[in-house]
Amino acid sequence: MATAKTIDLTGKVVREIELPDVFDVDYRPDLIKKAVLAAQANRLQPYGPRLYAGMETSARGWGSGRGTSHVPRLVNSSRAARVPHARGGRRAHPPKPEADRSEKVNTKERRYAIRSAIAATRDPTLVSLRGHIFEAELPIVTENALEDLDKTKQVIEFLQAIGVYEDVLRAKYGRHIRAGRGKLRGRKYKHKKSVLIVAGESAPILKAARNLSGVDVATVDSLNAELLAPGTHAGRLTIWTESAVEKLEGAFQ
C-alpha cells in the first residue's frame, strides 16, 4: 500500500499516512477519455435551424417550356429561391433538434475511469505533462485545518507556502482569445485549469478557493472524470485533505 506525507498549512510534514487502494489503480487513458467525452456530450443543448428557415418566400416554379431550369423563382423575377442551391435558400441537411447526441458509458467503466484518474494525480510525470507548475511532493495531502480557511487570501498564502501558486498564476495569465467562430458565440476566451482542491462536505474552503484562476473545488462525492482529467488529459494537480483521502477508501467501486 502506498503512503503519502501529510503537510500543515505552512508546508511542513507532520506525519505519514497510508493511501487507499484507489491510488494504485492502473492508468487507463482510453477509459478516462471515453468518460470525459461522454460527460461533455451529455451537456450539449439541442440545436438546429428555425422550422421555416429559408422557406418564407413567394417563389414558385415556371414549369417547362421556357428553356430554363425547373427551380422556384420569385414572383416578377427570374431569381431562384427556397431550394438548397439558391442563395438564401434552405439548408439541404440541417442539424435536427430532435437528434439524440448523448453518449452512454457503462457504470463500471465510468467508475474505473474516475479511479484511474485519481491514481494519476500522484504521478509527477503525468502532472508535468499537463503543464502544471509545482514543487510539492505528490500526492499533496494536507491536514483537515485546510478545510477551515474561509478567506481567499488565506488560500493564496497556503498555495504559496507549498509551492503551487505559480500554477494559479499560469492559469491567470494564460487566458487567450479563442480561434474560430466560437469567439462570437459567448466563449471568446480559453482558460487554463490549475489546482483541484478536494475537501469535506460544507467546508469553508469550497467557497474561499473557487474564485482563483483555474481552481476547481470538489468533494469526494462530486468528483468526476472531467474534473480529474480536463480535456481528457489525466494528471491534474490535486490537493487532498485527510478527510477526503479517508473517504476515498472503497469509493467508486
Swiss-Prot record:
NCBIfam families noted in UniProt: rpl4p_arch
GO molecular function: rRNA binding; structural constituent of ribosome
One Pfam family here: Ribosomal_L4
Similarity section: Belongs to the universal ribosomal protein uL4 family.
Organism placement in taxonomy: Archaea, Methanobacteriati, Methanobacteriota, Stenosarchaea group, Methanomicrobia
Top-level taxon: Archaea
Physiological role: One of the primary rRNA binding proteins, this protein initially binds near the 5'-end of the 23S rRNA. It is important during the early stages of 50S assembly. It makes multiple contacts with different domains of the 23S rRNA in the assembled 50S subunit and ribosome.
GO cellular component: ribonucleoprotein complex; ribosome
Organism: Methanosarcina barkeri (strain Fusaro / DSM 804)
GO biological process, one term: translation
Quaternary organization: Part of the 50S ribosomal subunit.
Residue spans of biased composition, Basic and acidic residues class: 95-107
InterPro entries: Ribosomal_uL4, Ribosomal_uL4_dom_sf, Ribosomal_uL4_euk/arch, Ribosomall_uL4-arc
Sequence segments annotated as region (Disordered): 61-107
Keyword set includes Hydrolase: no
Keywords per UniProt: Ribonucleoprotein, Ribosomal protein, RNA-binding, rRNA-binding
Comp. bias regions, Basic residues: 82-94
Record gene name: rpl4
Descriptive protein name: Large ribosomal subunit protein uL4
